[in-house]
Amino acid sequence: MSRPIEWSPENGAAVCLVEEYNYPMAIRCYKCNVLFDITGLPYTVDAFIEKHDSITSGMEGNQCRIKDLGDDWKKGLFSNFFFKTELSDTEEKITCTNCVWSRNVLKNSYYTRGMIKYAHDNESPACIIKNTEEMKTSDSWQYGNSCDVNFMQMETPFKKFTNKSVICSSCMTIIAGRDEHPTFGGFVNSHFINNPHCKDMDFLKNLSIDSRRIVVIANLDDFPDYNSDTSSSEGESSVGDEITYYNADEFTEMFGDDSDDDSDDEGIEDLSAYDEAMSVNDVDYKDVKERECSFSTWPKQMKQDSKEMAEAGWYYTGKSDRVRCFHCGITFGGWMPDDDPWSIHKLMEKETCGWLEFNPDKIPKVLRYIDDEGGEDKEEDGGGGGVIEFPKNNKEVENPKRGSCKACYERKADIAFIPCGHVFSCNICTMEMFASYKKKKRCPMCRVHVEKVQKIFLDEDEDMA
């Protein structure tokens, strides 16, 4: 199969990129983000541009027309993108010289600079390279140990937290150095991903831009030691006295190694002090489109659809598979392939979420009757109050049949919860209730933990009348 031509500034094709999706070959426009299939098209730039313009012309509100853009604009799309490439016998390592983002590709494999740029910009959104005009003509980016601006001697909010991480004293965000030689820009980028709302973020970005063409390798020993500065007032933040401080061993033991993305997360993960502090309404993600965009770096192996996740109120935190509700602030990780975003949200909410109340029809029927306020998952043992209350004016349940399922009122209630023994629902509704509930399954009547379920068989005389 013939390959598309190399898209370079010289041939005016920098406006799009070629990517592997569910199509044999697809193109995404940098300007309007439209993705379209080019299977069967001639492998020419003009054919791709014509296909793009024909699609966008039929899209309401999309005014992007590549053919109307000047060549200078097209060529400029590549000019602010600089990587150092290290060659080995079998592969090339393409590395961003500012944030240490990297991508390994097989030697002699087909890829364009556009592909690499797109991957970088999505996985490292805070990297300043794509926003710095003075770097457009430079090819001299190299790692360095010195710089006109010595960040380590300047008063920054970064302090050494462990041998591999720093902590921002303004917002208490912990930033791990994920590379053997972390850079100052890399710490700023990771900080932006984890907490873009830090009051010192603009200050940090400006410092990072001042690095010019030299990338500062961050020696963690040059940062002030956070653990020894217990009485300093610099570390005050909006968290106040509620924040809990951990030493390095306690932090690793409680929260694990952030670099392990394959950890067996189960249900709601134990939240760090930062997660607890941020469990509030996030107005920046109140727009469903903003939430959907946050899933641009969602792990490819995850089966949940980004649009459905966004509609259910979730946005991606950028860490492992952890997501957060923009409205109630609940955080969840450890998604299974068949987990439903709406069901998980309902089952995991600590308090009644206004977003779920606003979208009651999206929640599976059997989950709408669970009263979480009387039986939150805060207790480790036994049940707690919170008996199910059913709507009295529901036409479907005005005259329920004897022995019918308390969720659908259509089938027999033939599933017993062990050990409490309550018979509440039918087999189908029970599966729907527990399919997305990975741990701490509770009886919806008495809130006792359900260890197992048992199908029961009723005599014909006891069948529904």
UniProtKB/Swiss-Prot annotation:
Keywords: Metal-binding, Zinc, Zinc-finger
Domain of life from the UniProt record: Viruses
Repeat region (BIR), residues: 291-357
GO biological process, one term: regulation of cell cycle
Annotated PROSITE patterns: BIR_REPEAT_2 (PS50143), ZF_RING_2 (PS50089)
SMART domains in UniProt: BIR (SM00238)
Annotated spans, Disordered: 373-393
Zinc-finger ranges (RING-type): 405-447
Bridged cysteine pairs (disulfide): none
Gene Ontology MF terms: zinc ion binding
Transmembrane domains' residue ranges: none
Biased composition (Acidic residues): 373-382
The protein's name in its UniProt record: Putative apoptosis inhibitor ORF106
Organism: Ostreid herpesvirus 1 (isolate France) (OsHV-1)
Lineage: Viruses, Duplodnaviria, Heunggongvirae, Peploviricota, Herviviricetes
